Amino acid sequence: MYALLEIRGKQYKVKENSTILVPGWEEIKPEEVKVLMVKDEANTVVGTPFVEGAEIELEPVKQIRTKKIKVRRFKAKVNYHRKKSHRIRYTILRINGIKTSVLTEG
């Protein structure tokens, strides 16, 4: 069984016991997770736009930061130099379960 999710404007294809990388360190509320489609061996449910009665159990595993990205600016002949850097923050989520109340013939 797998599902298509939308979390913070990005879509993910997930299976049970898999992990996904979601931008940001803020806690993900259940209303932020929108289920777009659920499919098992024989049946498929496609939402219009979301599947009613579908729930995904998420567990935050770890919060990480990417490798540092460095940005440099330079203007010739005027002694202008700027250096900035940042690291993107991500949360690793584990999918513990996919639950849906209705599966229709597809």
From Swiss-Prot:
What keywords are assigned to this protein? Ribonucleoprotein, Ribosomal protein, RNA-binding, rRNA-binding
- Family matches, as Pfam families: Ribosomal_L21p
Its GO biological process annotations read:
translation
| Signal peptide interval | none
Q: Which InterPro entries match?
A: bL21-like, bL21-like_sf, Ribosomal_bL21
Q: Which GO terms describe its molecular function?
A: rRNA binding; structural constituent of ribosome
A single Gene Ontology CC annotation of this entry is: cytoplasm
Per UniProt, subunit arrangement is: Part of the 50S ribosomal subunit. Contacts protein L20.
- Assigned protein family: Belongs to the bacterial ribosomal protein bL21 family.
Give the protein's biological function.
This protein binds to 23S rRNA in the presence of protein L20.
Q: What is this protein called?
A: Large ribosomal subunit protein bL21
Species of origin: Coprothermobacter proteolyticus (strain ATCC 35245 / DSM 5265 / OCM 4 / BT)
Q: What is the lineage of its organism?
A: Bacteria, Pseudomonadati, Coprothermobacterota, Coprothermobacteria, Coprothermobacterales
